[in-house]
Amino acid sequence: MIQFQRLHKSYSVDGRQIVALHPLDLRIGPGEVFGIIGHSGAGKSTLIRLINRLEEPSGGRLLIGDEDVTALDGQGLRALRRRIGMIFQHFNLLSSRTVAGNVAFPLELAGTPRAEIDARVAELLARVGLQEHANKYPAQLSGGQKQRVGIARALATRPQILLCDEATSALDPQTTASVLQLLAQINRELGLTIVLITHEMDVIRRVCDRVAVLDAGKLVETGPVTEVFLHPKHATTRRFVSEAEHVDEAELHRDFAAVGGRIVRLTFLGNGTYEPVLGRIARETGVDYNILSGRVDRIKDTPYGQLIVALTGGDQNAARAGFVAAGVQVEDLRV
């Protein structure tokens, strides 16, 4: 368990106090994949670097288990950092070392015997699919391969927590998907707690269990990804979701003016996503429908669908009640 208790961070610049992170309270459970999303300058990198004390807090407490991280120094802080791995946006590999040498580096610093290092490096390179690239140098690798080296290196000391600082931002979409699949596999197989920061809601949707949304250094929304993604409350969260779904809300509302009837947003979650609910209820209630927008996708392993439809004719109240009875979440956009 990682607990932030009124943790905050400020800087002094030319005599002015700059607040990077306002006091916040947050809990991240053991074994979770927890996402932190925000635009540039929102405070997300500051927050994640407070966990391993790469940033020093200005106040508040940070607990990992029962240990107060904010009170550690010297040997205690070094021991903490061995339990926390970290991967970076631009990989931070040593160009003069081979792939195997980069993965071995933290073990060498820890004084691990050579035979143990060699065995651990071989194990990790197999896990990330790079066993055939052990003797190559970073300049000979693709971006995705470099990030896999970064992941293997971060796992070398058998950490309990893995911090991912914009780990896919420098990668193309296909490579991003493969790296996210690898992180999800590591979470499942090793039970690691993963804290991932990003500015892309699609990354959150694919791999995270819960998410926190930061805006201008403030925690503005948090909860399960299914709830936050499908029913965003804060304006910043709604913008992230619209960007992920490639929806122009202003254009969509202009489309509303061109159609008549009652407009509703229908949200299907789980196996019900694939049930023919809309057609059945239309037949039962005599309602006609016009689909204005639609999407079927997955949030991590859970299928979901969202439709915005205009209902005309028939018994629209009965249709709405029928959707609710079928487990569909209904939001009235225009009655």
UniProtKB/Swiss-Prot annotation:
Does the keyword section mention Cell inner membrane?
yes
From the UniProt record, list the reaction(s) this protein catalyses: L-methionine(out) + ATP + H2O = L-methionine(in) + ADP + phosphate + H(+); D-methionine(out) + ATP + H2O = D-methionine(in) + ADP + phosphate + H(+)
Per UniProt, the keywords (alphabetical) are: Amino-acid transport, ATP-binding, Cell inner membrane, Cell membrane, Membrane, Nucleotide-binding, Translocase, Transport
What Pfam families does the record tag this protein with?
ABC_tran (PF00005), NIL (PF09383)
The residue ranges of the ABC transporter domain are 2-241
Q: What is its EC number?
A: 7.4.2.11
Q: Where does ATP bind?
A: 38-45
One of the entry's Gene Ontology molecular-function terms is: ABC-type D-methionine transporter activity
Q: How does it sit in the membrane?
A: Peripheral membrane protein
User: Which top class of enzyme applies to this chain?
Assistant: translocase
For this protein, the record's InterPro entries field holds:
AAA+_ATPase, ABC_transporter-like_ATP-bd, ABC_transporter-like_CS, ACT-like_dom_sf, MetN_ABC, MetN_ABC_transporter-like, NIL_domain, P-loop_NTPase
Between which residues do disulfide bridges form? none
Localisation per UniProt entry: Cell inner membrane
SMART domains, sorted: AAA, NIL
Functional description taken from the UniProt entry: Part of the ABC transporter complex MetNIQ involved in methionine import. Responsible for energy coupling to the transport system.
What's the subunit arrangement here?
A: The complex is composed of two ATP-binding proteins (MetN), two transmembrane proteins (MetI) and a solute-binding protein (MetQ).
Q: What is this protein called?
A: Methionine import ATP-binding protein MetN
